[in-house]
Design a protein with these regions (language model features):
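Non-catalytic structural scaffold of enzyme domains
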Residues: 1-126
């Protein structure tokens, strides 16, 4: 078992809301959270600046020997994810956008199927 911590980072403290859910699923995991409250918000900054911040934070987390980095910031996920994966190939790096999009699409597909089944049954029984 890999006992190294999981690194989380966000441009502020919003990513902290993900931690309780993760701890319920993986109660023995150690977590290092970096909230960049000194430089928030990221959304209004140049992409080059955001990439610099993201690289600095990832460097810090890697120096703490994390086994994975979770980017809990939409701005960084959308502008820096691939760059960080290339820069840190030995660390698994995941963003927040893909998992959220998959969860939404799964729920929408399930809802569509339920609605379809409901109307199909209603129409069939008329």
């Amino acid at each position: 078992m890999d006992n190294r911590p999981i690194g989380f980072f966000d441009s502020g403290l919003g990513g902290l809301t993900s931690i309780p859910h993760l701890k319920r699923l993986l109660p023995k995991e150690k977590i290092i959270y970096f909230g960049d409250t000194a430089r928030t918000p990221y959304g209004s900054k140049a992409v080059s600046t955001i990439r610099t911040f993201a690289t600095q934070i990832a460097d810090f987390l890697v120096s703490k020997d994390v086994k994975m980095i979770v980017i809990a910031c939409n701005t960084v996920s959308s502008t820096c994810l691939e760059m960080l994966r290339e820069k840190f190939p030995d660390v698994s790096i995941v963003g927040i956008i893909d998992p959220a999009a998959k969860a939404v699409s799964k729920k929408c597909l399930l809802s569509s199927k339920i609605v379809y089944d409901f109307f199909h049954i209603k129409i069939s029984t008329l």
